[in-house]
Structure formats: C-alpha cells, structure tokens
Amino acid sequence: MSYYFKNLKPGQESDSEEDDLGKVLARNTQQEDESTDDELKTLSFGSLKKADAILEDEDSEDSEEEADKKMVNERKRKQVQEELKVSKKRYVEEEFEDDSSDSDSDSGSDNEGGFFEEDSGDEIGVKSKKKNKSRHKHAPTEHSSKKRVSKIRKIPGLETSRPKSNLYTDIRFDKSTGDDIDVNSIRKRYAFLDEYRQKEIDELEGMLKDRKFVNKLGDREYEDMQGNLKSMKSRLQTVKNRDLESKVIKEYEEKINMGNKNRYHLKESEKRKVLQKWKFDHMKAKQREKVMERKRKKKLGKEFKQFEFHKQR
C-alpha cells in the first residue's frame, strides 16, 4: 500500500494503477467489517443485557430530569402569579390610602387630618354593620327599583276584596265614594234586570234547539254557547234564592216581633236554622227521605270514628 502511495504522481495515473488501488481499498474495508463482526460474535449474553440495562437507566434518568424541570417551572409560575396578586392588592391599598389622605388634607389642618385618617379606617366596618343590622319596624318601607310601581296605591283602611279583573268597575259600589253597600236596597232598584236575563236565556235556548243553526256551528262554538247558557241560569237562580231567603227571614222577624216594643234581630246562626226549617217543610217526600238518609250516614260516621281502633295510639 505504501508503495502505491509513494509512486503516485499528479497527471501520470494509468487505468491499471487505479484498478489496483480500488482493489486494495475494498480489501481493507472488508477486513474491517470482518473484524467488527468477530468482535460482536465474541460478546456474551450477559454483557448484552448489561448494555441494555445501562441504556434503559440513561433513558429513565433523562425522563426524570425532564419531570424535575417541569415541576420547577410550575413552581416558578405559581410563585410569579402569587407575587402578581400581592402586588395588585398593595397597589389598590395604596390608591385607597392616597385618596383618603387627599380628602383629609382638603378638609382641615394637619392635626385634624390625623384624626380623620383614624376614623376613615373604621368607616368600612360601620357600613358593613349597618347593612347587617335589622331595620326598625317604624322605618320607611323599601321597594326594589327593578319592580314597577303600581298605579293604584294601597290606602290603609280600604282593604277591599279585589276581583280577578279590575278593568271595569262601578264607582257607585265603591266604599271610598259612599256608605256601605246595602244589598237589599240595590236588589229592589235593579229587580227589572231579571226580566232581561230571562229573555236572554229563552233566546239562547231557542237558538240551541234550532237544528239548522246548530249544524252551521262548530263544536267549540256550540260548547261555548252551552256553557254561557248554564252560567246565566245559575246566576239567575242564585239571585232568586237570595231574594227568597231574605223574604223568609223578614217574615219570621215580623212574626216574632208582632207585640214587642223593642225589635229583635236574628243572629246569623238563627237565620241559618230558620232557612233550614223552611226548606225542610217545603220539600217533597222523596227529597226529605234523601236528606234524612244523608244525615243518618253522617251521624253514623261520627259514631264509628269514636271506636277504639280509630283512636290514635
């Protein structure tokens, strides 16, 4: 090999010399590969396991180092966040102190300023105590600004039972415009309305009996008309029953006060008894039997509840 390298001259190479040089280089590389293969063949299984273990240890150490680095970075980040929070709080407190000192310096002299600075620290505690303190019963009422104020104000002493719809009202029957309502006198004045009510009921019944008219109506319209007819009949019947009850009570009071100088007025309980007696006297035989049977069952139920197995243990 040294012979060829010594005799090499630039510009005087031949093809045979180049071929010889290539063969020599190929032989050297082949010898090196064979030597490395022989070295690997001579290695035992134990040494290979040790090498694998060393590589695994190096990989684990690298992963542990990365985990430690991550932990350190997280701790640093948390410390920075806490420092930022503390700095913000300090900045807010300094601003609050600057504002309080400015207001105190404008209000008076230096001595007075020191006095007011001590009080300003306690103002926050006083406000919180006032909020937590319960209001006095004689204090003015407070309403939420989010709710709209009602157009009609509540006047003490004028608590009236408001109907479901207050859209239309008659001022003649309002307590604020006159005396208490006398139902009997109003009933006498407007007794002629019963005739109009009866006419409306008769007309509605005639319309519902007409088959041609009913066939033109839909199911919903027909049901609405039947409901209106039923409600009109019940209203008229209640008005008539009320008139009859007042008439019966009036006749009974006139009868018991026939020869008395001082007029005696019945109580509400006595009025109920008089009405029950009058209704029972003017009932038919079947109606009386039903009433007596109902009362007998009611009395039997009360007696049955008094037994020991119904008593609470």
From Swiss-Prot:
Biased composition (Basic residues): 127-138, 145-154
InterPro entries reported for this sequence: RRP36
Keywords, ordered alphabetically: Coiled coil, Nucleus, Ribonucleoprotein, Ribosome biogenesis, rRNA processing
Start-end of Acidic residues biased regions: 54-66, 94-122
Keyword Nucleus: yes
GO CC annotation, single: 90S preribosome
The protein's name: rRNA biogenesis protein RRP36
Subcellular location: Nucleus, Nucleolus
Keyword rRNA processing (UniProt): yes
Coiled coil: 64-95
Family: Belongs to the RRP36 family.
Subunit structure: Associates with 90S and pre-40S pre-ribosomal particles.
Chief location: nucleus
GO terms under biological process: maturation of SSU-rRNA from tricistronic rRNA transcript (SSU-rRNA, 5.8S rRNA, LSU-rRNA)
Disordered: annotated span: 1-166
Compositional bias of kind Basic and acidic residues: 67-93
Record function comment: Component of the 90S pre-ribosome involved in the maturation of rRNAs. Required for early cleavages of the pre-RNAs in the 40S ribosomal subunit maturation pathway.
Domain of life per record: Eukaryota
